[in-house]
Amino acid sequence: MAKNMAPILHILVISLSYSFLFVTSSSQNSQSLYHNSQPTSSSKPNLLVLPIQQDASTKLHWGNILKRTPLMQVPVLLDLNGKHLWVTCSQHYSSSTYQAPFCHSTQCSRANTHQCFTCTDSTTSRPGCHNNTCGLISSNPVTQESGLGELAQDVLALHSTHGSKLGSLVKIPQFLFSCAPTFLTQKGLPNNVQGALGLGHAPISLPNQLFSHFGLKRQFTMCLSSYPTSNGAILFGDINDPNNNNYIHNSLDVLHDMVYTPLTISKQGEYFIQVSAIRVNKHMVIPTKNPSMFPSSSSSSYHESSEIGGAMITTTNPYTVLRHSIFEVFTQVFANNVPKQAQVKAVGPFGLCYDTKKISGGVPSVDLIMDKSDVVWRISGENLMVQAQDGVSCLGFVDGGVHTRAGIALGTHQLEENLVVFDLARSRVGFNTNSLKSHGKSCSNLFDLNNP
């Protein structure tokens, strides 16, 4: 009996040994795969990063977002005051995770749309073309053209941070956006872009979806590069958190130089700050309480949104736009502080230009005085002047006419090489009192934007 049992026990021991080895090996492989895999939406990042570039032709800024399944880069215009992400889907949109929510669904309510959409472009269903879905209006922020498209949801991914380095990808599996009409990309935008990325204060803007999904502090930071060949970035999350500010090189110097002013948000979700006066070389351009410059809320001359806070921050104007009455006084005061013999014929769209050689000694800086007299945004050097032609430098401000969205609309040329913090949690905007370049820094060397 014992002899008959011996072979059986031997076989059993061998089987158990192989089973143990298999389980151990499988466990190790599983741990290895998990360690090397990209974090998904279940991971909770501290800070998210989107690299941004300047377009050489339009001087506007754009970035590549990662969307769809499998993930692919989609170039989109940066629209600070836009309500949502919109892209064109009529051609080359391929994704196994694309969905079009039904009309009157929860997603429609979240996007604040109660309009149903019926596609008439095709008899075959495709991304952007389904029936009985939600309709969502998208706008080209440069031309102001609008069109009705389909509310959609799909995967979106952004890079997290890992210490001072760019980290791995995290995903939102059901990110809401709009499949917009193709004609919206045909005018005014950089040639390569397929849509616009809205960062405004709206239910399904990129920041709000990121804050909600990942539990980030309601804050994002913008740093736009002044060169098409180098990157800037948008950071989503709290840059003042000790776990995060390691990502910003020389963060103590940069963050220490920041000042804050109250943030006002219009009914359209646009970002405004109060500019009480403009100063040129110690000469005040606009008195603090001048109703002709900044209409009061009782004035009916302008739209309500143009009367909130005085100055709107934008990324869809390459240069700062001033209401005509402000522009006239401002350029007159500026011209009085520059030798008259240096002035030359203006080059459009600018109203005041100079012979570059004759102002080589410099021009006066421009101070935007905020709600308090000691909170000042100084615009000087490359942020102030534009090389319009060979040998011709122009003041980088444009006459917007009588009826403008805001008395002042800060453009990208004045925002470049400056760290601008939109602290929505505390209703304030932070900025460097001087350009990063005055500290020998730039947006391109402030962050590590190389893929991990």
Curated annotation (Swiss-Prot):
Segments forming a coiled coil: none
Gene name per UniProt: Cgamma
Purpose: Sulfur-rich seed storage protein that remains undegraded at germination. The uncleaved form exhibits some inhibitory activity against GH11 xylanase from T.longibrachiatum, more at pH 7 than at pH 5.3, but not against GH12 xyloglucan-specific endoglucanase (XEG) from A.aculeatus. Binds to model phospholipid membranes containing dimyristoyl phosphatidylglycerol (DMPG), dioleoyl phosphatidic acid (DOPA) or mixture of dimyristoyl phosphatidylcholine and dimyristoyl phosphatidylglycerol (DMPC:DMPG), or mixture of dioleoyl phosphatidic acid and dioleoyl phosphatidylcholine (DOPC:DOPA).
Signal peptide: 1-33
Site entry (Cleavage), positions: 296-301
Main location: secreted
Effect of residue 439 to S: In MuX-H/S; loss of inhibitory activity against GH11 glucanase from T.longibrachiatum. In MuT-H/S; loss of inhibitory activity against GH11 glucanase from T.longibrachiatum
Tissue distribution of the protein: Expressed in developing seeds and in the young roots and cotyledons of germinating seeds and young seedlings.
Name of the protein in question: Gamma conglutin 1
Assembly and oligomerization: Two-subunit monomeric unit made of alpha and beta subunits coupled by disulfide bonds (at pH 4.5 and under non-reducing conditions). Monomeric alpha and beta subunits in reducing conditions. Can also form oligomers including dimer, tetramer and cyclic hexamer (trimer of dimers) (at pH > 5.5). Component of globulins complexes which accumulate in seeds. Interacts with flavonoids (e.g. apigenin glucosides) present in globulins complexes.
GO terms under cellular component: extracellular region
